[in-house]
Amino acid sequence: MEFWRHPGDLRVACDRARAGGSRVGLVPTMGALHAGHLALIAEARRRTDFVAVTIFVNPTQFGAGEDLARYPRTLERDLAACAEAGADGVFAPDVAAMYPPGEETRVRVGATAGPLCGVHRPAHFEGVATVVTKLLSLAGPCVAVFGRKDYQQLQVIRRLVADLFLPVEIVGATTVREPDGLAMSSRNAYLSPEQRRAARAIPLALAGACRAFARGERRAAALLEPARARLAAAATSIDYVDLADPESLAIWSDSAAIGERALLAVAVRVGTTRLIDNVVLGEDAPPVAEPSEEAS
């Protein structure tokens, strides 16, 4: 497996792979890799011949008071995991390489970035869009793979690629979950054992809405209120529990009657840790069984 620190080295390696007839796949990450990330690498491996993983804790997507300094950095362990997963190379630049002195360009995002996390992290998606554009420019992949846990990020990137006519297929990979249903996240490491137990309310809330939707419930309030109540009882605070159009991310009001597909997205804080998750009602299976079902 190759290891690149400089942007030009990533470009040269991907150019060389293409010249040899390989399809290039890109898996952008911020490191602290877990089984969810390894599933992204496997998906890229399945679709392409040369898989480049990027590990970069991108400062422009963190706001004031967020966890940039605290975010886990485990490069040596991550490199070993990438090699075992079959990556052909890892790009792990420092901040100065990606944002050299004098650089000032940012990618402006639109309406897709406005609701949900955009309300609470107003500069986040501009930072995401900027770094992803840089990485796509450097690697020139046929395919780039992102996790559906970060559903809004996935939609912002799809919009970016369409609007800028970038010749890359954006693949959204299924969320990988812990045995109790909690979505895998590098930030789960922040949770104490008690907080980790409380966080299980997230997949349970989503699962309850999935089952109600499957029974024919289409009133937004009837889907949202039980989820909000369950999360309010377990979380320190709630940023949002919303239903949205799965494509545009336009928010449906609590009084709406929704259609045959709907994104249910949540962001909560357990202690000081912000956790996000989602399901597409009408498409995704419940992320976890109800406790009574597990006991039967």
From Swiss-Prot:
Which reaction(s) are listed as its catalytic activity? (R)-pantoate + beta-alanine + ATP = (R)-pantothenate + AMP + diphosphate + H(+)
The upper taxonomy is: Bacteria, Pseudomonadati, Myxococcota, Polyangia, Polyangiales
What's the name of the protein?
Pantothenate synthetase
Any extra detail in the entry?
A: The reaction proceeds by a bi uni uni bi ping pong mechanism.
Coiled-coil residues: none
Q: Where does (R)-pantoate bind?
A: Q61, Q153
Which GO terms of type biological process are on file?
pantothenate biosynthetic process
Q: What does this protein's UniProt record list under function?
A: Catalyzes the condensation of pantoate with beta-alanine in an ATP-dependent reaction via a pantoyl-adenylate intermediate.
The organism's superkingdom is given as: Bacteria
**Residues that, per the record, bind beta-alanine:** Q61
Might you give the EC number(s) for this enzyme?
6.3.2.1
| Catalytic residues identified in the record | H37
Q: How does it assemble?
A: Homodimer.
For whether the record's keyword set contains Ligase, the answer is: yes
The primary location reported for this protein is: cytoplasm
